[in-house]
Amino acid sequence: ILYNKDTDVVILPEMWNNGYALEQLEEKADFDLERSTDFIKNLALQYQVDIIAGSVSNKHHDHIFNTAFAIDKTGKVINQYDKMHLVPMLDEPAFLTAGKNVPETFKLSNGVKVTQMICYDLRFPELLRYPARSGATIAFYVAQWPSARLNHWQVLLKARAIENNMYVIGCNGCGYDGKTQYAGHSVAINPNGEIIQELSTTEKELTVTIDIDAVEQQRKAIPVFDSLVPHLYK
């Protein structure tokens, strides 16, 4: 996919720098994203493409975060986000520190407004409302989602697309890590909740063409943001 001159943006999955080895994060985590950003910057510059760089274990001020970041084709870091929702079933809070800031809307080199979140964040629909209402047209979810809950992955991604009338891209790991099998099934979903393309359980690249105008059309047809009454939801 990196060799396709027409590619605007490349997406990587969650925790690609060391896998999901929570017990080893103290020794394997990056420091202030130094190694990870250098590596991704070189790729972005070499191939002249924006990169939604998945997430990495990242040590900052004696705390380890699960940090997603994005770099544009000039090598500039254009977004950084620390995973807010840590998975209690996997004891993530014992190894990681939760982020305190909601995901931001940021622009790709082509001017498209996007946002990014990490794995378990997908279960919290409130989180996407903020960037969606500020103009984000694509939400990238990077993950290591297990096969045991593949149905949840597929349904929730569709739900986020439909709720916010936007494109949702899910980039998930695959294969095994110890006894855990990851679901794969990276997927692109349009603002109507329809699958554009989807992978299976094996490692492969997925190339998708997106019509950004479809977001505006869908938001005009079903103006959910105009109908929100947040003061009544408290």
Swiss-Prot record:
It comes from the Bacteria. Residues 1-212 form the CN hydrolase domain. InterPro entries: C-N_Hydrolase (IPR003010), C-N_Hydrolase_sf (IPR036526), UPF0012_CS (IPR001110). The lineage of its organism: Bacteria, Bacillati, Bacillota, Bacilli, Bacillales. The active site is at 14 (proton acceptor), 83 (proton donor), 119 (nucleophile). Pfam families: CN_hydrolase. Belongs to the carbon-nitrogen hydrolase superfamily. NIT1/NIT2 family. PROSITE patterns: CN_HYDROLASE, UPF0012. This is Hydrolase in agr operon.
